[in-house]
């Protein structure tokens, strides 16, 4: 195999397999490696590509040296020593989003942020459909982007993570946004500023930047070519909240669009998501009637502050997607404001090096007991033990049982871990499903 044209795919999960399929269809020579002995897609891969070199259980420096280009799966860090060495030598290191961007010509709406990106991506996709457009919603949500190139839709709505943006260079979007920033993935970034810089890449070749007026530190120093469209709860913004006839309403440049009571989800973070989706939809020229219709009907996404059931006048919420401090803080604040009683929080898992101290004030205000699970339970306990009652559980079943014992009528039991799930579960969906099944069995 000629190394002049060899591409090496690093990582063989869903993304890596989609890259292999894409390159094979283009007759591009490639090889694959994964540091895991049994990566998720290896059996599929060897059945489909028995003659393609696959290295498992380690990374091969020899093979990386032979590569003209390296495609890095988002789960593999650019700081991985052998990868960092290749980058230092000037080797082209890209991800699947870059491969996608090189091969599509349809308009793209691109969305990132620490919290809310899956919800906003989903809502903008629904707005497109309501306007009669053929849309593909993909990226860090749903199917890999390379599987969405054919047949080509009218529009792409992409959810993008910081890891995906780090290895993307050719993305041109009609509109792009960073919804918000809070500490996440600090096991992959030296500082919050490094994490923000990765996110800011989304604006690089964007026609209409969409910005959060409540977090100007994200965007104020960026050299935009066009005036941004803004959204915000607390500051003057194009899409904002306004008082009208003694009701809080969503407004666009001062014009009242709808009272927030018409929304099924109207806690603060839901309103921020709605305002961001309206700004993105406006940039994509979606009629306002279609957008408002979608917002009125939208009732949320599984594992994102999802109501599970009421049992003995206690409400149970599954926010397993709350994998970072910012998401859990937002969930506590919004449910705490709405609760008749207090919150019992189930939290813990793999903290990813995060600082848990931003949870202190909302826990003090709304949470009467925290049930801790998982690897970084001791770190959470150290942060919160002076503020509220702390209990530990060895399993989700035990956590639900303890939280139910601690709750009384009017209280809310909230699973919002502020941590990744991989120490105890396959992923955050699995964690949320186990919580939901346990609650439904009460």
Swiss-Prot record:
- The domain of life for this entry's organism is Bacteria
Record-linked Pfam families:
Mur_ligase_C, Mur_ligase_M, MurD-like_N
Q: What is this protein called?
A: UDP-N-acetylmuramoylalanine--D-glutamate ligase
What keywords were assigned to this record?
ATP-binding, Cell cycle, Cell division, Cell shape, Cell wall biogenesis/degradation, Cytoplasm, Ligase, Nucleotide-binding, Peptidoglycan synthesis
Organism whose genome encodes this protein: Coxiella burnetii (strain RSA 493 / Nine Mile phase I)
BP GO terms, sorted: cell division; cell wall organization; peptidoglycan biosynthetic process; regulation of cell shape
Q: In UniProt terms, what function does this protein have?
A: Cell wall formation. Catalyzes the addition of glutamate to the nucleotide precursor UDP-N-acetylmuramoyl-L-alanine (UMA).
Report the catalytic activity.
UDP-N-acetyl-alpha-D-muramoyl-L-alanine + D-glutamate + ATP = UDP-N-acetyl-alpha-D-muramoyl-L-alanyl-D-glutamate + ADP + phosphate + H(+)
Q: Where does ATP bind?
A: 113-119
Q: What class of enzyme is it?
A: ligase
A GO molecular function annotation here is: ATP binding
Enzyme Commission number(s) of this protein: 6.3.2.9
